[in-house]
């Protein structure tokens, strides 16, 4: 359906979720190692930072504790950075000519992709975030019949993802993915 709406490439964020959890896992191991070696200034616990609504709440309610959340990007932002940098270069497409649109269930993802730290020279890593409801509306307006669509695979810019990325969005999925990784 996305290709019928005009999207040239359709990627899944599972690979980016794998990268996010690897980064969060590495950061946790680093903090624990430093703590166990006697560094009492290490911030524990480490909290995931992939929910922009939670990050926004934390920034406003606990500005003195901003070193506790992980520094890892969310899968949306991780993939946007990969697409706009690595993949664009690989495809010989100028970064600013590539439009990255994410399809996400949470409206807070719109706020996340507009954050200044997720842009390079004013060009956002993710240009637009559509909610799943907005996507459903676009599909309906385009009169796309799901029952008549042929099965298609996602494009794979960097290879296959693991099962850890698949469970990332479920309740408890980040922790389970971290333990699997």
Question: Which role does the model predict for each range below?
Answer:
Residues 1-181:
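Iron-sulfur-associated redox domains of electron-transfer enzymes in respiratory
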């Amino acid at each position: 359906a996305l290709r019928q709406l005009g999207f040239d490439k359709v990627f899944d964020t599972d690979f980016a979720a794998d990268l996010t959890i690897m980064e969060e896992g590495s950061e946790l191991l680093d903090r624990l190692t430093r703590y166990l070696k006697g560094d009492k200034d290490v911030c524990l616990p480490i909290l995931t930072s992939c929910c922009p609504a939670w990050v926004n709440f934390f920034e406003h309610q606990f500005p003195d504790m901003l070193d506790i959340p992980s520094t890892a990007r969310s899968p949306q932002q991780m993939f946007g950075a990969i697409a706009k940098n690595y993949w664009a270069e690989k495809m010989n497409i100028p970064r600013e000519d590539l439009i990255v649109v994410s399809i996400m269930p949470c409206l807070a993802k719109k706020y996340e992709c507009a954050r200044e730290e997720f842009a390079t020279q004013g060009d956002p890593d993710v240009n637009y975030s559509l909610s799943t409801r907005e996507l459903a509306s676009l599909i309906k307006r385009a009169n796309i019949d799901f029952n008549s669509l042929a099965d298609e695979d996602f494009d794979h810019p960097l290879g296959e993802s693991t099962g850890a990325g698949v469970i990332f969005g479920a309740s408890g999925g980040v922790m389970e993915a971290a333990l699997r990784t």
